[in-house]
């Protein structure tokens, strides 16, 4: 048997930003490995070539991306690395400016320019590797991107400027990738795109997410399928029917609502009212009684009055969502909202974000306390600080609650499902003991 000879230059890929960027980096690494590169992901070891996959979503993300580029540009000047390439959303949006400001970078590439990046490295884009993605997550779960881009025109959002229009992947291609992941031990798939519920409208002329879910649920080895980034306007209610009928589809929905005051929603161009939102949440809970609802909200949008913000607070208390995240408004150039005055001081934006999280913390604590004395199915992700750390069906990695099980007196392996008896709870964690490994 022949031994593969790797290229002598070592490549390190750095990923910043969201799970969609993570998938892009994983696909890039797959192509580099297929071209015989010795490639690592975010290694501390010495590397010859650095590729930074950037985020340009909001100011904080842009600052992190720029600082990371500058750090590696300095290391290149000092001779620690030979080549520095930048790709991703920041590069897509500000390529011309970045080329002038950071000349140490050998080349900048946009979000859809992987073939050009590979060509710069004297490598080929290998179509046969599509669907055979290397994953950077623990081996038992993976993100599965079903579409790219977004057709929405939310006034605050720059994503369409960086990711382009919505393009759905072919169902057969998605299934091939999902089956490949399952063969390699993946048990949980997290479906992602900029707008999950739009899937299929461009290529199949109808919303195809329910059909895709039904087919993914047939794949042997996959036990959990989780839905991220659904858009509330014109939500296809058939998704709830599939969720209720198919045990593999997690009773979990991540649906960013952004706000809950009608005038603000209009200024945001969200194409939905508070009344319609409440009706959608009620329908979800009627069809899937034990559904976990996650959402994110945006505070400090231009013109947001104290009364408008209070209506948002009242909604969050009334809706009693299971998981909530908050962003403060970032005044993004070239968006429709950029023409409005960014009139909310940063201190007030942060104060409002903190007030939302105080409300949600109390809601989360009450919901978690109600789980004490119950036995829940848990998937273990890691060992940390003397505990197995896992998640329930109602929790996604990194952003949601965790279940902590002491190492002493319990035994499990990473990637195991187990029945865990809950003995205690805090605002964002559950504590328990293992009853049975599944």
Describe the residue ranges of each PLM region:
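Conserved, mostly hydrophobic/aromatic
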Residues: 154, 174, 191, 227, ...
